[in-house]
Amino acid sequence: LVEFPQRGHWSIGLVVGEPGDVIEQALGEPVMTVFVPTAPNPTSGYTIIVPPREVKELDITVDDALKFVISLGVVAPTGHRLGRPSA
C-alpha cells in the first residue's frame, strides 16, 4: 500500500524495483519504484518513486492485488474479508 494520490488515501501498489543511483542521489535517500495500477484496467497506472518507509507491505499475492483492483475493490484478497464502510 502507498498513500496515493494524496496523504490519507491508500492505493494498491506493486513494488517493481529501484530507480537507480541518479534518482537516489538527487533525492538524498534510498527509494523504490512502485507501480500503482488504475481500476478497472490495471495495464495503465502511475509509476511513483517513494522511500521504503512510505510503503506498507501486504501479505497477498500479485494475483490477489490485481483481482482487488480489477473488481474495483469488491473482491478482497484471499483469506481476508472487507468490512462495511462506517456511516
Task: For the regions a language model picked out, list residue spans one by one.
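Terminal membrane-proximal soluble interaction domains of membrane-associated proteins
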Residues: 1-87
